[in-house]
Amino acid sequence: MTDTELYDAIVVVTPNDFKRVESNNKRIVDYLPVRKVLFVGSKELGELVAQSSLGDKAGFVDENDIIPFDDVYNCIRDIMSDILLGRELPRGIAGWYYQQFLKLQYARVCQDKYYMSWDGDTVPCKDFSMFGDDGRPYFDLKHEFHEEYFTTMNKLLPNLNKTIDKSFISEHMIFDCHYVIKMLEDIEKNAAVKGKMFWEKILYSIRLEHIQENSFSEFETFGTYMAVNYPDIYNYRNWHSFRYGGYYFHPEVITQRDYDWLSKDFYAISFEKSHSVREDHENLFNNPVYQSKLTARQMVEI
């Protein structure tokens, strides 16, 4: 299905992660309620997308056309110089922050009112809409709390503190470009924090002893910014997704029957690269006999 409001989705993903869930990329393209799904990454990723059978609804955007990776890498390396002591900065540390900055900076190149960000390791189980009956977009909420996210955002924008009980982190978000740009401009106006671009100020706002712990969340920050400053722009919805799907299913062999079963409880399932199916879960959750008697949520809770 496609929402009445036309917009695209961006999926920021590495070539390795694109290949890791390759058999499910078509499902991401087919099930997201968007006009096009734009995979954002390196030129190698662009080649993989071009060689795929994802069809005309899939596209590619070079990450360096949004923000050059080297700019972010060099900034983090300079900030961490007293920790690194001449050693090379692991690309993974820079990559975690970089992919979040891409999702925010995309608002400045997007030609539509909205765009969605969708995590590349997460696969929709069923159709869904990102807009309520009143035409407002949804913030989808889950349960998560990481104090350092709020420490960082409060340095960036001192009026931001935890505002709602739940979390805005739900493996995806629909962004209103106008308000994302407004937030980025507000961050860039904060003369108390070093840096010129918003992403520089974010990096300089993170406590050095926590910079290797992924201490910023683009979803938590934008959701909190909107809840505090523009509380009537978005609807709130509880989002049910299977975050630890990789412990129960192999992404390369999960079937339509499995997705139909999962969809009774969940909008989406995630296959994180650190997850693998435990031996005692093999042939258990994909067993049609068990699926006919129990829901996925009941199986997990047993």
Task: Give residue ranges: language-model regions.
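Active-site-proximal specificity loops/subdomain of glycosyltransferases
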Residues: 48-108
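N-proximal low-complexity "stem/linker" segments adjacent to membrane-targeting elements
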Residues: 1-26
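Catalytic core and acceptor-binding pocket of nucleotide-sugar-dependent glycosyltransferases
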Residues: 168-259
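Short aromatic/hydrophobic "clamp" motif used to bind/position activated sugar donors
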Residues: 115
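Short, acidic, metal-binding catalytic loop of nucleotide-sugar glycosyltransferases
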Residues: 26-35
